[in-house]
Amino acid sequence: MENYGLFIDVGNTSVKIGIGVIDRLLISYTLSTNNSLSGDTLGIQLLQCINHAEQVINKDITISSCMMSSVVPTMDTLLQYACERFLLCKPHIINQDFIIPLDNHYEEQCEVGADRLVAAYAARRLFPDSKSVVSVDYGTATTFDCVTDNTYLGGLICPGIKSSLQALYTNTAKLPSIILNTASKVPIIGKNTKTSLTHGFLFGFATMTEGIYSKLINVLDGPVTFVATGGFARDMANVVCCFDAVCPDLILDGLHLLWIDCLSKSYSL
């Protein structure tokens, strides 16, 4: 029977669910982060994801183990209950049950979010020929996480695109809703509010990214690989010139790689 792993990335805005086998991730899903849901409701949602995946690959799926990264502690207990009751497996939670195999140089190691460490680990594993790697995650916050050799050096935490836009909506009247994507490689001088907002946000964050990149390459040992991830990764990669790779589900990739490591070392999962 083939080994199937379940991978759960719990962020402040969304929960990403991945299902994979040894050699690859098969499929992923995105749910809204909602800690008011019951564990039973979350369990049913997990089963719905698995049932859909079975239809896609035309095979029965029995989850043998689960790896979870979470930055929302209130979701941990709910998802643990959901996995144990509905999937008959206990999720292994990063930084609780399993430690990322990077030399962590953060002053207070417990302060680093599991998502940042998993993304950094994935970037390190996926691009082994680079002396240094930087994962740039466009999530609720925009984070830059730096690894040289096998050492997690730390990083930068900047405002997030969506949360910044929501703050603007909250404090400003009459702003229209916008979709943050564009086919243009250069900013357009907006002649309406939607265009002004779209290009202001996209190219504003693009310039921030490129500015930080230009500083980091002077302090990191090279060569340096810059990797974009998160919900806005593809949109930002269209207007940012410094990315070497775009991996929208880098945290799921990292959980999958950690799962493979555990299986290869015969850890109990």
From Swiss-Prot:
Belongs to the type III pantothenate kinase family. This is Type III pantothenate kinase. Its EC number is 2.7.1.33. A monovalent cation. Ammonium or potassium. K(+) binds at D137. The active site is at D115 (proton acceptor). Keywords: ATP-binding, Coenzyme A biosynthesis, Cytoplasm, Kinase, Metal-binding, Nucleotide-binding, Potassium, Transferase. GO terms for biological process: coenzyme A biosynthetic process.
